């Protein structure tokens, strides 16, 4: 069935930019900047739906489930970007948050013709992951009508997985297909139909909230410190030390000693210092409290 794209908000013309090709560079950028300021407010309007999705993802993680993003083009790339940042930031397994893009890995750098129109591909990509009812699938598409994503959402619902959609058009097909509809309506783009702009920015803000919120709820943040960060490069090794110092008030030397005694596991080092435990005692207490530092400190 053909869709009249001109009826979509994301495909409509923006009256603020109809003469943008006649403006000076600074005037052009002012128009873009003014339009961008609308994005955060659009996201604010859908915080309840984002919160509901965060809670669903947190519950999935607690039950051994995964978060799977699905999208085509820019939307798919944003999902992959968000997923790829979770292991170094929060020490998660690469399979805990997964990003799928229509057309596969080659589509990350180069568009794959007709991939987004393939309903079956969306279903097959999820089947290849051995999706279960414990997983959460989040479909991403500015238009809210991408067949690849709709196919995935349909399959996910059929096996009992929780589904959510992120789109920038009201009353779209994806909103109806998902258990939770996140619809930040950002309005027409500065360049008509260029949904990598405001719509893409809104999607990125929502994705930031989904994984950050779920990781906080899963005990991977103490205060506002990323206490499960892994030491995969020199910058992150130094960040680990700084995190332990900030969390405990210890000196850098004390922080380094604790980290070196526990294979540079931030949570363990923090608990060692704050609760005056050795590495094995701290690891054991953390495990007993599912990795939550505050609970381990209270030890109730």
UniProtKB/Swiss-Prot annotation:
It is an enzyme of class 4 (lyase). The active site is at residues 85, 116. Residues 57-220 form the SIS domain. It catalyses: N-acetyl-D-muramate 6-phosphate + H2O = N-acetyl-D-glucosamine 6-phosphate + (R)-lactate. Gene3D superfamilies: 1.10.8.1080, Glucose-6-phosphate isomerase like protein, domain 1. GO terms for molecular function: carbohydrate derivative binding; carbon-oxygen lyase activity; ether hydrolase activity. SUPFAM superfamilies: SIS domain. Its EC number is 4.2.1.126. InterPro entries: Etherase_MurQ (IPR005488), Glucokinase_regulatory_CS (IPR005486), MURQ/GCKR (IPR040190), SIS_dom (IPR001347), SIS_dom_sf (IPR046348). GO terms for biological process: 1,6-anhydro-N-acetyl-beta-muramic acid catabolic process; amino sugar catabolic process; N-acetylmuramic acid catabolic process; peptidoglycan turnover. Pathway: Amino-sugar metabolism; 1,6-anhydro-N-acetylmuramate degradation; Amino-sugar metabolism; N-acetylmuramate degradation; Cell wall biogenesis; peptidoglycan recycling. It holds the Pfam family GKRP_SIS_N. Keywords: Carbohydrate metabolism, Lyase. Homodimer. Specifically catalyzes the cleavage of the D-lactyl ether substituent of MurNAc 6-phosphate, producing GlcNAc 6-phosphate and D-lactate. Together with AnmK, is also required for the utilization of anhydro-N-acetylmuramic acid (anhMurNAc) either imported from the medium or derived from its own cell wall murein, and thus plays a role in cell wall recycling. Belongs to the GCKR-like family. MurNAc-6-P etherase subfamily. A lyase-type mechanism (elimination/hydration) is suggested for the cleavage of the lactyl ether bond of MurNAc 6-phosphate, with the formation of an alpha,beta-unsaturated aldehyde intermediate with (E)-stereochemistry, followed by the syn addition of water to give product. This is N-acetylmuramic acid 6-phosphate etherase 2. The lineage of its organism: Bacteria, Pseudomonadati, Pseudomonadota, Gammaproteobacteria, Vibrionales. The gene is murQ2.
């Amino acid at each position: 069935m053909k869709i009249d794209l001109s009826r979509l908000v994301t495909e409509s013309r923006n009256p603020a930019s109809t003469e943008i090709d006649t403006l000076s560079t600074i005037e052009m950028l002012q128009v873009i900047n003014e339009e961008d300021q609308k994005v955060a407010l659009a996201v604010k309007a859908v915080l309840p739906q984002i919160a509901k999705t965060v809670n669903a993802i947190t519950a999935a993680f607690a039950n051994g489930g995964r978060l799977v993003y699905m999208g085509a083009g820019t939307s798919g790339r944003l999902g992959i970007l968000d997923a790829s940042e979770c292991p170094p930031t929060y020490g998660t397994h690469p399979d805990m948050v997964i990003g799928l893009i229509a057309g596969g890995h080659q589509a990350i750098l180069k568009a794959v013709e007709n991939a987004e129109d393939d309903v079956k591909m969306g279903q097959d990509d999820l089947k290849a992951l051995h999706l279960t009812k414990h997983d959460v699938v989040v479909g991403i598409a500015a238009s809210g009508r991408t067949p690849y994503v709709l196919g995935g959402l349909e399959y996910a619902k059929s096996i009992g997985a929780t589904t959510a959609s992120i789109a920038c058009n009201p009353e779209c097909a994806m909103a109806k297909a998902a258990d939770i509809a996140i619809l930040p309506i950002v309005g027409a783009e500065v360049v008509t139909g260029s949904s990598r702009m405001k719509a893409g920015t809104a999607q990125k803000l929502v994705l930031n909230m989904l994984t950050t919120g779920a990781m906080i709820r899963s005990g991977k943040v103490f205060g506002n410190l990323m206490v499960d960060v892994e030491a995969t490069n020199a910058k992150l090794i130094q960040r680990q030390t700084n995190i332990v110092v900030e969390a405990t008030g210890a000196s850098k030397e004390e922080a380094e000693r604790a980290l070196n005694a526990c294979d540079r596991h931030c949570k363990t080092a923090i608990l060692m210092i704050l609760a005056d435990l050795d590495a094995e005692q701290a690891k054991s207490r953390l495990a007993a409290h599912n990795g939550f530092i505050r609970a381990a400190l209270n030890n109730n």
